[in-house]
C-alpha cells in the first residue's frame, strides 16, 4: 500500500478528529509505513497544548528517520502535542533517567530495559493503561512474545510496552572456514570444536584471529549461561542473591581468557561499547567468528551483501539443557513522576504498532517483540535469521542491571581476567564482595 501524497481536506479533517486510523506519513520514502493501522485517537486526551519529551536509544535513530516519521504522524492526529525526540547512547540512559526522576523533571517516554528500571522504582505502573487498551483492542497483549512481556513486568504489574527483542548467535566468515577446510559450525557443534576452529583460523602472519571478544557484561553473560552458570538468582517477591563467584562462572571466564592468552583472539579494549570493535574487525576480515546480534546480521547484509556471512546458534556445552544464550528486550516506559502519562502511553502504543515495527525490522535489523516475527515469510525466508529465531527460544534474560554496582563489579572482573590482572576466581570473588554491598532483598 503506497503513501497517500495528497489528502483531501475532508479526509484531513477526519484524521485530525480521530476518525481516520491510517495516520500516513508525509515522507514519500516511507510508503511501507502503510502496513498496519494506528490506534485511533483517544477521545479522553485533553486538547490542551503540551510538549512530550521522548528519549530513545541512539542506535535506533542515528541512521534512520523512522521515528521522525512516527512523530509527524502522531502530531497530525494529536495536533495539540509537540513531540521532542532525544537520542542517547543506550548504556547511559538508566543513569540519566535516575537523575531526571530525582530532580523532579523526568521525560515522558524512555526506551530501555523496563524490568530493571521498574525494579529500581524509576518507572510508572501502567496496568490501568494496559487494561483500557485491552478493552478497545482485546489482542493488545496477545501480540507480544511472552518473554518480552516478562521484561516489562515487575511483581505482576506492567511498567511498559515491549519494543524489540534480541539475543546472541555465532556469526562467522564462511570463506575463512572453507580456506581452512573446516566444516561450518552448524548443527550440534560443541564448545571444543569452537576452540579448535579458533585455533586453526588464527593466522598471525595474516593479522587474522579466530575469535573476537568483548568485555561488555551483557555479551559475556552469554558465555556464562552457555556454561550453565548465572550471576543473579531470585525474584522480586523473594529477593535476589548475587552469584558472581560461582565456580561455573569462573570456568566460563577461564575458557575465554585462555583463548585470549593463546592468541586466538585480540585482547579487547576497555573502552565503552568495545563490542563494536569486533564487528568492524570481522567486516575487515581480521577475525573469523564472534558472538553477535541480529542487527549485526542486518548491517552486514545491507552494507556488504556479497560478504561470505555464516550464522549459527551458540555451541552445545557440557551444561546441555541448562545452557542458554542471553535474552535482551527493550521497551518503552514512562518515568516516575512524568506529567503527561495519558498522552505518553498513546505515543507508546503508536511506536510499538506494526506500522512502525515492520520497517524497524526491515531498515534497522531491530526485530519487534511480536508473535508474528518467527513465522513471517518476509523474515523467515532470510536463512541467516533462522538461527537467531531458533536461539530466541533458548535464551535467558539478563537481570544484573537491576543492581548497577554489582553489574559494574562484574564488568571489572571480566577486564581483570582478560588483562591477566587476576584469576577468574579471584576477580569474581572481589566482584561478589563489592556487589554484595548493594541491596538485594525483596523489592518494594
Regions found by a protein language model. Name each.
Residues 33-42, 114-167, 192, 310-312, ...:
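Hinge/lid segment of periplasmic solute-binding proteins
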Residues 42-45, 127-144, 187, 230-251, ...:
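Short, solvent-exposed loop/beta-turn-alpha elements that line the ligand-binding surface or hinge
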Residues 69, 73-143, 179-181, 281, ...:
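Extracytoplasmic "Venus flytrap"/periplasmic binding protein-like
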Residues 72, 76, 82, 180, ...:
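Extracytoplasmic/periplasmic substrate-recognition and gating elements
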Residues 99, 108, 136-176, 209-210, ...:
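A structural signal for short loop-to-beta-strand junctions that line the ligand-binding cleft
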Residues 153, 326, 364-367, 374, ...:
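C-terminal capping/gating helix-and-loop segments adjacent to ligand/active sites or protein-protein/ligand interfaces
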Residues 154-163, 168, 192-245, 287:
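Extracytoplasmic/periplasmic solute-binding protein
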Residues 198-200, 238-271, 314:
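Glycine-centered hinge/linker elements that transmit conformational signals in sensory
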